[in-house]
């Protein structure tokens, strides 16, 4: 993939520097290292792991796109943008505990690291308990980071409220996702899947960064509403792609166990479509494989084949494209500066190279 423009690369470097600076600041302000050196060290290491930084980047691009052209951009914007990355980390920490995952971004999950603080037969339980607490700390730090923005008080208060509402919506999505995991597949409808995608992924990954940046910059109400709609569409498409990658990509590329989504029996669009489309013996085989408590790599290959035969991969890829088309239609009508419209479009397109590659490998036109 071609590198981002120099402006985007510099913005990402500034986000990383701001995140590192914030980690040093909380060491001074909260004295986490005095409570327990491993607590601070593990939160810092987890937060600074390499990532796309897509959420803070979108917040910054949205803000710059709507603020007056001659306005000097304060460094506090980059510092505050880390709030959305910390919110992301908080979600990941708790999500990994719920899913009992061992890997995150190619390294041990935070609860696995914390479970090794002391030698005990109850190491796994200890790791889960400490991970929940560490996640709560990271959420509080996210709000602290947000408060560092220097902007008009009314805008700041409204943006903070939106940020907190987003955290609540995302937790609701996690709640629904966890319930879906134990419900019979026959009870899950496509609309339930998309509601979960909206709550658990779209709200905090795209909707919140774009809307918060626009609110802080003083964007008009119509554009704020459209940005929220656009964010939900991209977020749904992004989660569909993530589900596809979890089945059709390699563990090396995704940085977590390739069997994790299958092990948790997640009710994805792929799963929902296959169940609805398959008949008789094929459906019975699919249900048998899907409901197995301990799935093997051979089971994964069999489920991949079923998704291909049922047309579920093709259907899911077309749903991604449908949402991207709608996204770019909305983007074209926003009253955002054209330079940032094009940059945001480029950032979005780059996020979907994985699904393009998978479609190409399986000779599927979308």
Residue map of PLM features:
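All-alpha prenyltransferase/terpene-synthase fold signal
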Residues: 1-366
């Amino acid at each position: 993939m071609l590198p981002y423009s120099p402006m985007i690369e510099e913005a990402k470097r500034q986000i990383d520097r701001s995140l590192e600076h914030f980690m040093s600041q909380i060491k001074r302000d909260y004295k986490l290292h005095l409570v327990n050196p491993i607590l601070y060290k593990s939160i810092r290491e987890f937060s600074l792991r390499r990532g796309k930084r897509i959420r803070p980047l979108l917040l910054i691009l949205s803000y710059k796109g709507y603020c007056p052209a001659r306005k000097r951009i304060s460094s506090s914007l980059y510092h505050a943008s880390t709030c959305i990355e910390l919110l992301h980390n908080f979600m990941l920490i708790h999500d990994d505990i719920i899913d009992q995952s061992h890997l995150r971004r190619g390294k041990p999950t935070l609860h696995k690291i914390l479970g090794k603080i002391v030698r005990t037969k109850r190491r796994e339980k200890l790791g889960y308990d400490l991970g929940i607490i560490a996640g709560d700390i990271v959420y509080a730090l996210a709000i602290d980071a947000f408060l560092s923005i220097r902007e008009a008080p009314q805008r700041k208060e409204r943006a903070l409220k939106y940020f907190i509402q987003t955290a609540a919506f995302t937790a609701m999505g996690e709640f629904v996702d966890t319930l879906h995991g134990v419900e019979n597949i026959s009870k899950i409808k496509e609309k339930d899947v998309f509601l979960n995608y909206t709550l658990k992924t779209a709200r905090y990954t795209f909707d919140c960064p774009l809307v918060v940046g626009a609110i802080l910059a003083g964007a008009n109400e119509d554009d704020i509403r459209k940005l929220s709609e656009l964010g939900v569409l991209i977020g749904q498409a992004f989660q569909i792609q993530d589900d596809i990658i979890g089945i059709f990509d390699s563990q090396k590329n995704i940085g977590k166990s390739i069997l994790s989504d299958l092990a948790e029996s997640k009710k994805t669009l792929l799963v929902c479509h296959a169940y609805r489309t398959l008949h008789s013996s094929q459906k019975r085989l699919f249900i048998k494989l899907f409901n197995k408590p301990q799935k093997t790599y051979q089971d994964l290959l069999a489920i991949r084949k079923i998704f291909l035969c049922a047309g579920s991969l093709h259907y899911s890829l077309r749903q991604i494209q449908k949402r991207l088309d709608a996204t770019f239609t909305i983007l074209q009508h926003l009253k955002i500066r054209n330079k940032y419209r094009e940059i945001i479009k480029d950032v979005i397109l780059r996020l979907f190279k994985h699904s393009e590659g998978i479609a190409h490998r399986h000779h599927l036109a979308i």
